[in-house]
């Protein structure tokens, strides 16, 4: 096999071995990054003891949450929060 063909074969096989060993890169989720950035700019924690967040673009109570549990309305299929001040 000529050197050029051998070199091309090695260059084609080498990345496959690297991907198999390391695994594919995790999918990039732009939505999570946007929400995280928005929360850093606009959200204010009520206290250090509670995980609730005062205002957030996501309609959830708690977790990545949208508002304090006391003012969150979860009567429907989706939780809603009062508008941020």
From Swiss-Prot:
Keywords from UniProt, A to Z, are: Disulfide bond, Neurotoxin, Secreted, Signal, Toxin
Propeptide stretches are: 22-40
Q: Where in the cell is it found?
A: Secreted
Extract the GO molecular function terms from the UniProt entry: toxin activity
Coiled-coil boundaries: none
**Signal peptide, first to last residue:** 1-21
Q: Name one GO cellular component term.
A: extracellular region
Name the organs or tissues of expression.
Expressed by the venom duct.
PTM text: Contains 5 disulfide bonds.
What this protein is reported to do is described as: Probable neurotoxin.
Domains as described in the record: The cysteine framework is XXVIII (C-C-C-CC-C-C-C-C-C).
- Protein's recorded name: Conotoxin Im28.1
Native organism is Conus imperialis (Imperial cone)
């Amino acid at each position: 096999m000529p050197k050029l063909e051998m070199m091309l074969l090695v260059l084609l096989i080498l990345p496959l071995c690297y991907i198999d060993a390391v695994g594919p890169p995790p999918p990039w989720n732009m939505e999570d990054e946007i929400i995280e950035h928005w929360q850093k700019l606009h959200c204010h924690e009520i206290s250090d003891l509670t995980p609730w967040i005062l205002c957030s673009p996501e309609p959830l109570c708690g977790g990545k949450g949208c508002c304090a549990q006391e003012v969150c309305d979860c009567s429907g299929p989706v939780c809603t929060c009062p508008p941020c001040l």
